[in-house]
């Protein structure tokens, strides 16, 4: 619905675990896929179909697998629990062409520390859009928290 209502918006799908979910997401208008882990079957499927994919990684072996599959961007998940920005910096050192998109534990207080590192292309965070806020129809609060995140990035 979002992709149809707002065609200028880049809409993707997250927590994609299977090729069937890839197909459903793309058919619903997703332009890119993000997954919590590196499933070679899902990555190859996306690459073969020309669908941008960002699989989750949390160690050098995952990064090397991503490189072998032709990727140069990975999700680092769960970021804070897996060592945060210091772990990303350590992993980025030998993999000079790799870029990272951390998610998991990112919030308004640590967002800038991630985005200040040049190897970070984006951060994901659910702190702005909690289920309770959505279910409660608290869209002004979501708007306020989203604006706060944008202001941090400026």
Segment roles from a protein language model:
Residues 22, 43, 63, 85-88, ...:
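Generic structural signal for well-ordered alpha-helices
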Residues 1-59:
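Glycine/small-residue-rich loop that forms an oxyanion/phosphate-binding "nest" at active or ligand-binding sites
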Residues 46-51, 132-154:
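C-terminal helical cap(s) of enzyme catalytic domains, especially alpha/beta-barrels
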Residues 11-14, 33-34, 53-56, 74-76, ...:
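Hydrophobic faces of well-ordered beta-strands that scaffold small-molecule active sites
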Residues 18-28, 61-69, 92, 106-122:
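Catalytic cores of alpha/beta
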């Amino acid at each position: 619905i979002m992709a149809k209502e707002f065609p200028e918006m880049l809409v993707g799908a997250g927590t994609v675990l299977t090729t069937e979910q890839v197909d459903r997401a793309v058919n619903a208008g997703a332009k890119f896929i993000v997954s919590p882990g590196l499933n070679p079957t899902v990555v190859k499927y996306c690459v073969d179909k020309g669908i941008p994919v960002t699989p989750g990684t949390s160690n050098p072996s995952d990064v090397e697998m991503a490189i072998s599959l032709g990727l140069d961007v990975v999700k680092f998940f769960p970021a804070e629990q897996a060592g945060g920005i210091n772990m990303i910096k350590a992993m980025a050192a030998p993999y000079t062409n790799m870029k990272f998109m951390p998610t998991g534990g990112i919030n308004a207080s640590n967002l800038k520390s991630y985005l200040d590192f040049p190897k970070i292309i984006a951060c994901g965070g659910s702190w702005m859009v909690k289920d309770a806020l959505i279910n409660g129809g608290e869209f002004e609060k979501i708007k306020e928290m989203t604006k706060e995140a944008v202001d941090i990035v400026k």
